From Swiss-Prot:
Keywords: Cytoplasmic vesicle, Endoplasmic reticulum, ER-Golgi transport, Membrane, mRNA transport, Nuclear pore complex, Nucleus, Protein transport, Repeat, Translocation, Transport, WD repeat. Component of the coat protein complex II (COPII) which promotes the formation of transport vesicles from the endoplasmic reticulum (ER). The coat has two main functions, the physical deformation of the endoplasmic reticulum membrane into vesicles and the selection of cargo molecules. It also functions as a component of the nuclear pore complex (NPC). NPC components, collectively referred to as nucleoporins (NUPs), can play the role of both NPC structural components and of docking or interaction partners for transiently associated nuclear transport factors. GO terms for cellular component: COPII vesicle coat; endoplasmic reticulum membrane; GATOR2 complex; nuclear pore outer ring. The gene is SEC13. One of its GO terms (biological process) is positive regulation of TORC1 signaling. This is Protein transport protein SEC13. Belongs to the WD repeat SEC13 family. GO terms for molecular function: structural molecule activity.
Length: 304
């Protein structure tokens, strides 16, 4: 395990490895992003410090390497910045700025690469925006109302084998765009692209939490059935599954509530392990047993 000390001058809000697990991007309330090369299991090297935001930076997201060394970031300043590293100079620069939100942008998430270079953004203004980075260098976006008093996070549905058998033209691929959002209205919503309306339509509304839903994560594996995890300020994590009739059902991850607010939830790449972090400063791991119940799979030891 690599431990990086004194990385930022203020709270660190996100830390994300790239596709290959060789580079780490971190972001902080100090308004900077730092890029590290990870060398083995113990060594690291700071290679860049990126400045451009005017407020705390909440989240960063690496694009798939097929699009190059590209990073998206979002901030309290209401901006989404797209950064690109020039391979010859290894210098980072801002190549796009997304400024259509009227409040803090709380999360950014790249679509499955099969769907193209598409970025999903959520904001405290209650809206969600989806930005397309087109092959000709232009961008286009759709923005719509999602959660009246603020959207906290979003997660794309995985690109399925059934999707991949259809045509690869842009309009057909748009039909396979599907994602889930969560908000300060205690709700979780699933959205799908509507080709007739040319925007995203609400497919389902999931009710189960009694306080703000802070994070949502769609499992990257749909081999058995879809799984969505939601973490809430009500100190619970819910696991949502879809039955054969298309209805969504939820079950609590644990019988007892967590000791504090649940901030984040994240699936392993294989989709069988769920990590949960909360206000108790712990990261716990969970796995579904053969009876369909969720049980502890350990705890990540944090350096204090």
């Amino acid at each position: 395990m690599v431990t990086i000390g004194n990385a930022h001058e203020d709270l660190i809000h996100d830390a994300v490895l790239d596709y290959y697990g060789k580079r780490l991007a971190t972001c902080s309330s100090d308004k900077t992003i730092k890029i590290y090369d990870i060398e083995g299991t113990e060594n690291y090297k700071l290679t860049a410090t990126l400045t451009g935001h005017e407020g705390p930076i909440w989240q960063v997201a690496w694009a798939h390497p097929k699009f190059g060394s590209i990073l998206a970031s979002c901030s309290y300043d209401g901006k989404v910045l797209i950064w690109k590293e020039q391979q010859d100079t290894q210098q980072w620069s801002i190549i796009a700025e997304h400024t259509i939100h009227q409040a803090s942008v709380n999360s950014v998430s790249w679509a499955p690469h099969e769907l193209g270079a598409v970025l999903l953004c959520t904001s405290s203004d209650g809206k969600v925006s989806v930005v397309d980075f087109n092959d000709d260098g232009t961008t286009s976006h759709v923005i719509f109302d999602a959660h009246a008093i603020g959207v906290n996070s979003a997660s794309w549905a995985p690109f399925t084998a059934a999707s991949s058998t259809s045509s690869k033209d842009a309009n057909t691929l748009k039909q396979h765009r599907r994602f889930v959002t969560c908000g300060s209205d205690n709700l979780v919503k699933i959205w799908k692209y509507d080709t007739a309306l040319e925007t995203y339509a609400e497919e389902a509304k999931l009710e189960g939490h009694t306080d703000w839903v802070r994070d949502v994560a769609w499992s990257p594996s749909n081999l058995v059935r879809p799984y969505i995890a939601t973490a809430s300020q009500d100190c619970t994590v819910l696991i949502w599954t879809q039955d054969k009739d298309g209805k969504w059902q939820s079950q609590p991850l644990t019988e007892e509530k967590f000791p504090d607010v649940c901030w984040r939830c994240s699936w392993s790449l294989s989709g069988n392990i769920l990590a949960v972090s909360g206000g108790d400063n712990k990261v716990t791991l969970w796995k579904e047993n053969l009876q369909g119940k969720w049980e502890s799979a350990g705890e990540v030891e944090l350096i204090k």
